[in-house]
Curated annotation (Swiss-Prot):
Pfam families the record matches: zf-C3Hc3H (PF13891)
GO cellular component, as recorded: nucleus
Polar residues composition-biased segments: 585-595
Reported function: Putative regulatory component of the chromatin remodeling INO80 complex which is involved in transcriptional regulation, DNA replication and probably DNA repair.
Comp. bias regions, Basic residues: 524-558
The protein's name in its UniProt record: INO80 complex subunit D
UniProt subcellular location: Nucleus
Region listing for Disordered, in residue ranges: 521-573, 581-600
Keyword annotations of the record: DNA damage, DNA recombination, DNA repair, Nucleus, Transcription, Transcription regulation
Gene Ontology BP annotations: DNA recombination; DNA repair
Transmembrane regions listed in the UniProt entry: none
Subunit structure of this chain's protein: Component of the chromatin-remodeling INO80 complex.
Family statement drawn from the similarity comment of this UniProt entry: Belongs to the INO80D family.
Length: 812
């Protein structure tokens, strides 16, 4: 279904209204569409077309919709404008009232012509007649409604329709007669004012003898001069009291008498007053009011009809002591309030039954189905008409009853109250029928037999067994045995009244089951609490996604570290070896772990572990929470990638060590040059050895270690192991006695160790170069990442480099 932009709902019943897009429309929607009849053209699928009329003054087309099924081009309003259909004549709303006013004015004018205004005045100056004011008289069609019989409950609606024309004629005649009687009453009252009072008139009706004046002043007034003594001035009766008048027909007198006599409580007529008349008092005489009793009699008739209808609605048979449930009581009230003919037979079911009787081809034919459907709709229409007619009749009955009750309560409140009390008692008796008295139930004992004899317990109501032996009755369905079993496997035989559980339990076993379930829940909670860690290092990031790290593949095998001892005939002298203890190489930040604390069988366990076993991040998930709390000072994680960051002092020492390494690299480059020139001749080597032995070479190394670069001596004199404890230096890298004493020169040691002059040519240079390369490799492999911003080869002093070049030139 297509909808516009303005989708809103009604504030009264919250139903959707027209969704017209250009502006807000508060009209109701058409069935099946989202627009009203005025704006339904916005929906292109609607079966409507636009009016083709175009206005002349603005050249705009009419927007009224026309059904597509109708063969016309213009809407109804423009068909009238164009003259295709006649225009409707609008009737004025005040036409009926104007007719009534003109008719009333004519009546008052005729009355004023027949009766002079002075004749309606009493001698004391009071008006004799209570004339109705202008406009108080109702028209004839209002009088017709009053003259209708409101108690025609048994009349059928069809008969009412047939007799409407006859009834209207009769009512119009009655209204005319009533108006004539009214005029004759006025004329008779005018004649009665000035007529002499007869002593005993045999023609006077008994109703006139009972008639007395309501207000009779006995004041001594001057009587008119032209009248005799026996003339009595009677005050006329009020117009609002419907009493028989003198000039009325004898039929009206008899009706008044019968109504007066049929009253339930006739009003006694007081005897004439015998007291002397007084001038300062006005004597009031109580008279019978038969009009009041007519309202009560009307109400009595309605009450009788209501009770009769209630008796017809009651059941023919008693309830046999069974009370109505709440639902049935509500259904009974609903049925009382609902209109008759509410339950109707199903026409569709009857058609299906007829279809079964017919042949298959005839039943499935289109014409037969259309005929059946038409018949169904006709019957349904008749049924709805009956329902509507019954509903209207019921509303009319209720309105009549309320009107009669109001009038009777206004006139006779006591009698009306008594009637309502009687009606209420009959209603209560109908809604709550008298139940028959239940027979006296005798106390019966259980009929079960036990070992000692018969059971003495009291039997349950409507049974022959007590609670303990109720299971012996095979016909009962309310009780069942307990489904629990004891420790020895015996079934519990206690009866249980439990209709909610599939496995009923007695009271004892139910308590045990509750305690067991409660303890099981507490154990689960306690176990769950024990599994939680005692201390959380960091709160888990709930919003942060955890990325799983990929498993690293097998690492590539690293190149083997070259051995500390040089290959070939060049061996490391024992005098140059520097003793380094392994225990002193550990980082000062790590705790001192002794092997005594380890278990005895740890060596066997270590040998069983395969060497190709890889460790992943998941392997540490169970190990890290078990670490003791006293490892807070343990530098396990430092830096971003877990590397050990050097302190300021270590950085300074490392800088000095790297400067020494650069000097050793210079010496190694010199040794390479000398090795290249070694093939030129033996003279050069002999001269180098002699020069080196005489002290020139020793002076060079001595001056190098003492004067030019004092840090090199400190580096080689054992400060490396002390300042860089984290370096794992090889023990055969440097000797312990070499360069330990600054006064000792390298020449004596070299001459003592190397006796062959052929192998001594490059021994010192090779030693220094190999030791420098080894030391540099160890330092660079451990601290190249941490000391990268500190490295600066330009810090090597130019004097040291120039001195080294000078001495090497002399040595060559």
């Amino acid at each position: 279904m297509y909808e516009g932009k303005h989708i809103h709902f009604s504030e009264v019943d919250n139903k959707p209204l027209c969704s017209y897009s250009p502006k807000l429309c508060k009209q109701r929607r058409l069935n099946g569409y989202a627009f009203c009849i005025r704006h339904v053209l916005e929906d292109k699928t609607a079966p409507f077309k636009q009016c083709e009329y175009v206005a002349k003054y603005n050249s705009q087309r009419c927007t009224n919709p026309i059904p597509k099924s109708e063969d016309r081009r213009y809407c109804n309003s423009h068909l009238q404008v164009l003259g295709f259909i006649p225009k409707k004549e609008r009737k004025k709303k005040n036409d009926a009232l104007e007719d009534v006013k003109t008719k009333h004015q004519m009546e008052t004018m005729a009355f004023s012509l027949t009766v002079p205004p002075l004749a309606l005045k009493m001698p004391n100056g009071h008006d004799g007649l209570n004339l109705s004011p202008p406009g108080a008289r109702l028209p004839i069609h209002y009088l017709e409604t009053d003259l209708e019989d409101p108690f025609s409950f048994e009349e059928e609606e069809e008969e009412l329709k047939k007799g409407t024309s006859v009834k209207k004629k009769l009512q119009s005649k009655l209204a005319q007669n009533w108006q004539r009687l009214r005029e004759t009453e006025i004329v008779n009252v005018h004649q009665e004012h000035f007529s002499p009072h007869p002593a005993h008139s045999p023609l006077q009706s008994p109703s006139l003898q009972e008639q007395h004046t309501l207000v009779q002043p006995i004041s001594t007034l001057p009587k008119p001069t032209g009248l005799p003594q026996n003339l009595v001035c009677k005050s006329p009766q009020p117009s609002n009291i419907s009493q028989p008048v003198q000039g009325a027909s004898p039929v009206t007198h008899t009706v008044a008498q019968t109504r007066h006599q049929s009253s339930k409580r006739p009003f006694p007529v007081l005897p004439p007053v015998t007291e002397l008349p007084r001038n300062d008092r006005i004597q009031l005489a109580a008279t019978a009011l038969p009009a009041y009793s007519s309202y009560v009699s009307r109400l009595q008739r309605l009450v009788k009809l209501c009770t009769r209808k209630q008796q017809l609605d009651t059941d023919l048979f008693p309830h046999f002591g069974l009370d109505w449930s709440e639902d049935s009581g509500e259904e009974q009230e609903d049925s009382d309030q609902s209109s008759p003919y509410r339950t109707a037979w199903s026409f569709r079911e009857s058609f299906r039954y007829d279809c079964k009787k017919l042949d298959i081809e005839e039943a499935h034919s289109r014409s037969s189905r259309i005929a059946q459907l038409c018949t169904y709709f006709q019957q349904k229409y008749k049924h709805l008409c009956r329902l509507e007619r019954a509903e209207s009749c019921q509303k009319k009955y209720r309105h009549t009853f309320r009107r009669a009750l109001q009038q009777a309560a206004h006139r006779e409140s006591e009698t009306t109250g008594q009637l309502l009390q009687e009606l209420r008692t009959t209603t209560c008796i109908r809604t709550r029928p008298i139940q028959p008295e239940l027979r006296g139930t005798e106390v019966t004992l259980c009929s079960a037999t036990i070992s000692n004899g018969a059971c003495r317990n009291r039997a349950l109501p409507y049974t022959r067994n007590c609670f303990q032996h109720i299971l012996s009755n095979s016909s009962q369905q309310l009780f069942s045995s307990c489904t629990a079993k004891f420790a020895d496997g015996q079934q519990c035989s206690v009866p249980v009244f439990d209709i909610t559980h599939q496995t009923p339990l007695c009271e004892e076993h139910a308590k045990k089951m509750d305690n067991f379930l409660r303890g099981d829940n507490s154990r689960k909670v306690q176990h769950h609490q024990q599994r939680k860690p005692r201390k959380k290092t960091k709160p888990p990031a709930l919003t942060k996604k955890t990325k799983k790290k990929r498993r690293r593949g097998p690492r590539r095998p690293q190149k083997p570290i070259p051995p500390a001892v040089p290959q070939g005939n060049l061996c490391m002298p024992s005098s140059l070896s520097l003793p380094v203890e392994v225990s002193s190489i550990r980082s000062p930040s790590t705790p001192n772990l002794s092997t005594e604390e380890l278990p005895d069988d740890i060596t066997s366990e270590i040998t069983d572990i395969p060497h190709d076993l890889e460790l992943n991040q998941e392997d540490f998930s169970d190990v890290l929470p078990r670490l003791p709390d006293d490892l807070q000072d343990f530098d396990f994680f430092e830096g971003k990638n877990g590397d050990l960051l050097p302190t300021t002092e270590e950085a300074e020492e490392l800088e000095r060590a790297l400067q020494a390494v650069t000097s050793l690299e210079c010496l190694s480059s010199i040794a390479v040059l000398t090795q290249a020139d070694n093939a030129t001749g033996q003279d050069l080597s002999d001269r180098g050895i002699s020069a080196f032995s005489t002290g020139s070479g020793g002076s060079v190394i001595q001056s190098l270690s003492r004067e030019d670069h004092p840090d090199l001596g400190d580096l080689l004199n054992g400060h490396i192991g002390h300042n860089f404890a984290s370096l794992e230096l090889d023990e055969n890298l440097l000797g312990s006695t070499t360069l330990s004493n600054p006064s000792a020169t390298l020449s004596g040691h070299i001459q003592g160790q190397f006796s062959s002059p052929a192998n001594v040519g490059l021994s010192s240079a090779t030693l220094i170069s190999r030791s420098g390369e080894r030391l540099g490799r160890e330092v660079m492999s451990h601290h190249v990442d941490a000391a990268a911003p500190i490295l600066d080869k330009q810090r090597v002093s130019g004097a040291l480099y120039s001195g080294m070049v000078k001495h090497s030139a002399e040595w060559v």
